[in-house]
């Protein structure tokens, strides 16, 4: 948190309205160095661009990861600005013919096929273009899976090929000369916080992939193990134990004889969540029908994650004594307070009824762990408020 304090003080000293995203690119580099250097030799890290696709974020990340995982033509184009096409993998449901043609024409590394119909459409495009394409089949396993915030499989969802249909899709893919089936893509859980349980999930992936490869007699070259590594917003001191996971993961690879299979992770939240801060100031404090509210500059149209996940987002308060007005600030202490934005909706809530020691108008609120699924998923122009400004902290300077 100390890294953002000088920036906040500078903004306040200049009487600059405080409503910013601040990204710690130095911390991002250190994090990426650690996680990528600890992976086994047959494992590669891809960045799931959907978590945050700001150009300076992508530029920094591109120097450490094998490539980008993308889910649209627009994301392919963003990725191509920093990586060649053979370092881009294309997944996600509902790919259009236009997107598939674009991916094929650009030469993306692999396409993760989500259904028999998508496979047939891709094959028709390849025949029309007289090209070949490496693919993985995304499988929606039946489960059961460990506890996690989000489940992408094991229950009805729009993702992947139902496990009971996989055999038919494999046979179809193997019969298509333009299709090179390299293996499987699994992404069954999201925001898992237990590193030991994550190893168990990977073990299940290995078992399923090997069984299908042996049954259908094709070489298993590649498994995408998804992302799914979580962030604990409720307790920032108790996060996913990456080092423990990697050590057990390495052992599992040897035990399951997977050393000759290329393994991928496609992480997003785990890579960028902790390096972002949404910083805003208190405009008003008032009591309505017995409940205290602090109204902040901006709102969830800029930082939607707390509404999307229905949680109280972690924050710190920077107190400021200066008062630009001739009348007193509004101040409260030791009150349960709800932090809201400027939107004309009661759903515009960052944190609800949280105990606050002291808060005044003019104070600055710093929402931590705002680097993933913040600005990128928000409805920016609701009520036409100004957009936040963006500051990127590097070794030598602040970039805006």
Curated annotation (Swiss-Prot):
Q: Where are the transmembrane segments?
A: none
What Pfam families does the annotation carry?
Orn_Arg_deC_N, Orn_DAP_Arg_deC
Q: In which pathway does it act?
A: Siderophore biosynthesis
> What catalytic reaction does the record list?
2-[(L-alanin-3-ylcarbamoyl)methyl]-2-hydroxybutanedioate + H(+) = 2-[(2-aminoethylcarbamoyl)methyl]-2-hydroxybutanedioate + CO2
What EC number(s) would the UniProt record show? 4.1.1.117
* Residue positions binding pyridoxal 5'-phosphate: 228, 266-269, 373
**Superkingdom of this protein's organism:** Bacteria
What Gene Ontology molecular-function terms does this entry list? Answer: carboxy-lyase activity; diaminopimelate decarboxylase activity
Explain what induces or represses this protein's expression.
Answer: Up-regulated under iron-deficient growth conditions. Repressed by Fur under iron-rich growth conditions.
Alphabetical UniProt keywords = Decarboxylase, Lyase, Pyridoxal phosphate
Q: Where is the active site?
A: 344
| Cofactor(s) in the UniProt record | pyridoxal 5'-phosphate
Database matches in Gene3D superfamilies: Alanine racemase, Lyase, Ornithine Decarboxylase, Chain A, domain 1
InterPro entries hit by this protein:
Ala_racemase/Decarboxylase_C, De-COase2_C, De-COase2_N, Lipocalin_CS, Orn/DAP/Arg_de-COase, Orn_de-COase, PLP-binding_barrel
Q: Which GO terms describe its biological process?
A: lysine biosynthetic process via diaminopimelate; polyamine biosynthetic process; siderophore biosynthetic process
* Residue(s) carrying N6-(pyridoxal phosphate)lysine: 50
State the function annotated in the UniProt record.
Catalyzes the decarboxylation of citryl-L-2,3-diaminopropionic acid to citryl-diaminoethane, the second step in staphyloferrin B biosynthesis.
Family, per the entry? Belongs to the Orn/Lys/Arg decarboxylase class-II family.
Quaternary structure and interacting proteins, as annotated: Homodimer.
What protein is this chain from? 2-[(L-alanin-3-ylcarbamoyl)methyl]-2-hydroxybutanedioate decarboxylase
Where does this protein come from, organism-wise?
Staphylococcus aureus (strain NCTC 8325 / PS 47)
The beginning of the lineage is: Bacteria, Bacillati, Bacillota, Bacilli, Bacillales
Q: Which gene encodes it?
A: sbnH
